[in-house]
């Protein structure tokens, strides 16, 4: 689920607002064009936009998912971690019988991905602490998204921005897991199994591999694989990916996704066109994203207690947390008191002038 081009190219695209076609290899998309259809954004919206108390309101969801004008937090790895395999669950390829990599090497790559995403998940939990003061009241300066959020590399100070950024990066990776791995798909039954047609596990979401709250080694099925990726992504593989399962052979990155329902149609990659592989990958990514959002809420409760976590979740989901979530900070209460006092003073002055005139 990522744009397969250099980070410098991505920066130029954003600056120019001209989304030129990307290189032939692409992941679940973050842009519109070149075969991509903002797949990450639409998956995230399908997973987390709903009318309930624990769902994200429009402006907040736009910051997390993107809105067509920017990547959003979930697209950030395609801007700053485009060449980091662990951020996209790449390079965990393996095939039984005379393969150039061992099962242990593939499992190590999966583990590296999980540990990377655990780090992002834990950072989101950590940054949520900055949403509230020591009394559990919302700090308005930390929760408003006016003007958008700056990239983490530019020192964005607001707790809501940074918590959403870290969680979005974790979501990017778990969504990529379904697009880039054999977890949810199946091989083409009309062709022999091999590096160009690896076996699929056809398993549902959520995946036991993606235990982001855990600390132990993930349980990796013996036939699980993700694709080897190089810039010249092809079948058969070239360079370090020669004789290996490649991203080009295994990905189910592109197609149309309904941002409201998650319905997936018109798959755009060879593996995605096999059976219902693209739809399975999208469904898996939607289900997993919802699961990780529940996991984040549970992690906040474990870390901060039920009362503080409840206010944190409200602050992370609502567009106007000081008004909607209660528990205003001392600064907000003082400002409200001052405004009320001024109002009473004006009323009193008007009444006094009226009596004097009489």
Task: Put a short name on every predicted segment.
Residues 1-9:
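Bacterial N-terminal signal peptides that target proteins for export
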Residues 16-24:
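C-terminal segment of classical bacterial N-terminal signal peptides
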Residues 24-168, 176, 180-326:
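N-terminal, motif-rich segments that launch catalysis or mediate targeting to/interaction with membranes
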Residues 172:
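Catalytic PLP-binding core of fold-type I/II PLP enzymes
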Residues 327-339:
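Juxtamembrane/start-of-transmembrane alpha-helix segments at the extracytoplasmic/lumenal side
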Residues 343-358:
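C-terminal membrane-anchoring or membrane-association module
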């Amino acid at each position: 689920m990522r744009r397969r081009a250099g980070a410098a190219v991505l920066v130029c695209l954003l600056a120019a607002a001209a989304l030129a076609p990307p290189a032939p290899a692409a992941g679940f998309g973050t842009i519109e064009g070149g075969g991509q259809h903002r797949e990450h954004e639409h998956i995230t919206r399908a997973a987390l936009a709903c009318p309930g108390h624990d769902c994200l309101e429009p402006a907040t969801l736009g910051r997390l998912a993107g809105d067509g004008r920017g990547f959003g937090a979930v697209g950030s790895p395609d801007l700053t971690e485009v060449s980091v395999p662990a951020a996209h669950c790449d390079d965990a390829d393996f095939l039984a019988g005379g393969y150039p990599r061992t099962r242990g090497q593939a499992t190590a790559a999966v583990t590296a991905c999980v540990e990377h995403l655990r780090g992002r998940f834990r950072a989101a939990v950590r940054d949520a602490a900055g949403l509230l003061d020591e009394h559990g009241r919302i700090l308005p300066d930390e929760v408003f998204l006016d003007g958008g959020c700056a990239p983490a590399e530019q020192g964005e100070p607001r707790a809501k921005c940074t918590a959403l950024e870290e969680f979005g990066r974790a979501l990017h990776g778990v969504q990529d897991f379904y697009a880039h791995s054999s977890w949810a798909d199946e091989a083409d039954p009309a062709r022999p199994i091999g590096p160009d047609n690896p076996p699929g596990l056809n398993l549902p979401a959520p995946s036991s591999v993606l235990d982001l709250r855990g600390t132990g080694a993930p349980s990796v099925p013996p036939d699980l694989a993700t694709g080897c990726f190089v810039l010249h992504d092809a079948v058969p593989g070239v360079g370090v990916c020669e004789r290996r399962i490649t991203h080009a052979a295994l990905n189910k990155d592109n197609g149309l996704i309904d941002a409201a329902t998650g319905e997936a149609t018109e798959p755009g990659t060879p593996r995605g066109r096999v059976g219902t592989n693209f739809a399975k990958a999208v469904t898996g990514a939607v289900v997993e994203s919802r699961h990780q959002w529940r996991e984040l809420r549970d992690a906040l409760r474990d870390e901060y207690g039920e009362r503080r976590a409840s206010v944190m979740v409200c602050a992370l989901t609502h567009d106007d947390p000081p008004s909607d979530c209660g528990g205003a900070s001392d600064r907000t209460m003082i400002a409200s008191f001052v405004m009320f006092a001024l109002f009473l003073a004006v009323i009193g002055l008007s009444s006094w002038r009226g009596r004097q005139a009489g």
